[in-house]
Amino acid sequence: MKQKIVMSLLLLGFAIGGAAQNALPDTLLFVFKLHGQTRKYEMTFTPKNDALVLNWRILRNLKWQKGSYALTPQAVEKGTVLSFLMPEDGRHITLPEHETAYVLSQQAYRSLKARQRFDYNHTEYILLDSDERVADFALLHVRDTLEGGEMWILDNPALPLVWSMQNNPLEINWRVEINK
């Protein structure tokens, strides 16, 4: 009987350990490349009553600057525009109902999964591959059909995070890193 209990505890420990590897950490590091400069923002995404709150912070001149973006329930469900609003210290901004920040809306994510394409910012994106993985999630690699901008989107229906943006015509590129 003792042997069965010990074996059960070991198996439970392995299962919990494996599940922990699949989870994203609470805080993600966004590394932005903008006009030759690099900026690193720590960001957390917190669901709140069908909405989503993104808290950000950055260490500048030995002082933490911070703020937030709130995505309305309508934006989380049906947003069609990715906001590129620059963070400003102390500002807590609720984005318009058609805008999201660093995530796709549920409608766009469902379209990407079902049709291998979606529209955002009045631009069509098509799925190229899903070869890369992070935290045991696939990254859905898409490219816009007009100017060649690319995104890698976390294949996670709970948080379809834009993990990386490259070749952005606005020259606002980023990649998420997981702090170890």
Task: Put a short name on every predicted segment.
Residues 1-7:
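Bacterial N-terminal signal peptides that target proteins for export
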Residues 4, 18, 164:
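Functionally constrained cores in energy, signaling, and assembly domains
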Residues 8-11, 94:
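Acidic/proline-rich low-complexity IDRs
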Residues 11-19:
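Hydrophobic h-region of N-terminal signal peptides that target proteins for export
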Residues 21-86, 92-180:
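Acidic, serine/threonine-rich low-complexity disordered tracts
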